[in-house]
């Protein structure tokens, strides 16, 4: 069995090496036109008057996170009003076009709202059920977390644009923020592979949004979609706390304890994880918090540290990534990212289910499919 596993690995490596030689230009753009440059995040204060938020998401944008965000907003005297279309495990396509091909666009009728009741997302965006809240100013939307699988099978670019167009029909001045989802941890005892993956995935998510922004609207005008870099921020948080064991509120915690502090399982968040993402999302949209004494159900030192680390991350992110565009994106994901993505998926999902050899056969088939079709 060990010999067969080694042979399987060798076959994958040889084939991948050949593919890299044959497709070295895969990430080179075929267009000579200069792409439009988009701001990653709003300028501080730009969104202050836009506080009515509609969220289209799944279990990574749960009610506890949004309630924390609402509590933070009230504490800094910038109260938000929100509602959501939440459908666990869903893609943007599921929440718009729908899963039933015979009922086009029935996906807008799926999912539950902030109260756990069924929702008609189109009707809600057109006329909010929140009393005296007015039109929704902001759409916060996320995708399934398996990035390349979502691009291929769920047509992220197509349905992100479709959802944006439906949203701005109800408010032409509405703003859209794409919330980057994080993938499952491959090993909770060693988060380094997950952190490395999320760092590699972030530029690909940016390319997805840039390409959507580059597409012409069917009608009218829309503000460019911005990005809430939740996945990268979460990876940065875990990496920072592991590397800095004296951090206030998290002192002397083991790497596994830090991971368990934020993750209920291998992907869903605890209260501390949701609080960090709430602080990150609020500050990504509205800028750094202007108050430090913010009540929370978390211990004060933990909550204060999480808010500060979210702010510090965003300050670095604004400096390092003030804008994004599709110039470096090419016609599809780079072969190096396809290799990294399929390796991570094989190790995290396929191998525990199928075994080493079958998982690597699947990985090679997936690599070919992504290279040909993305």
Regions found by a protein language model. Give the residues of each.
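N-terminal signal-anchor transmembrane helix specifying type II single-pass membrane topology
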Residues: 2-23
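Structured segments of extracytoplasmic/periplasmic soluble domains
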Residues: 63, 68-76, 142, 166-170, ...
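Signal peptide processing junction and immediate N-terminal pro/mature segment
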Residues: 20-33
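N-terminal module-boundary/linker segments of secreted carbohydrate-active enzymes
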Residues: 30-75
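Conserved SGNH/GDSL esterase-like catalytic core that processes O-acyl groups on lipids
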Residues: 63-157
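Alpha-helical cap/lid subdomain in secreted, periplasmic
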Residues: 124-267, 271
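Conserved catalytic region of serine esterases and O-acyltransferases that act on ester linkages
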Residues: 251-374
